[in-house]
């Protein structure tokens, strides 16, 4: 969040926030004995949950980030819910911040809109086989012509810390508000 709101680019291309596929999709290609907890190696890694990006060894699942925000997941459903929440918040931040930077910023383009194959985790908004993730709906909402948006600095706050944000009214319609 902090990186995005302090960035100043004319465009954000090939950007994304990663998250896992839904439980039903994962169960269709990950063997039952490997489903939980996910670990490097095996089907999770074969399907890009681990080692998909050299800069982040636990990408694209990002277990370390999930544990930072939510603690260790107790089951697969909780893990997926946590991961999809982070992806959704990240995608919403990307699209809304890009719009707040208009007219200097002219576009936000995701790296991968939909997955072409069974992927355990990734930056897509639509999982294989054409099932929208929660992030898809956040992106859709973030692109509506008129909206109120909050520029939130970060997701984790500690007791006693002052919460600061900016509220924006975005209007890309042809009508005055």
Regions found by a protein language model. Give the residues of each.
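Substrate-binding clefts and catalytic carboxylate motifs of secreted carbohydrate-active enzymes
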Residues: 2-177
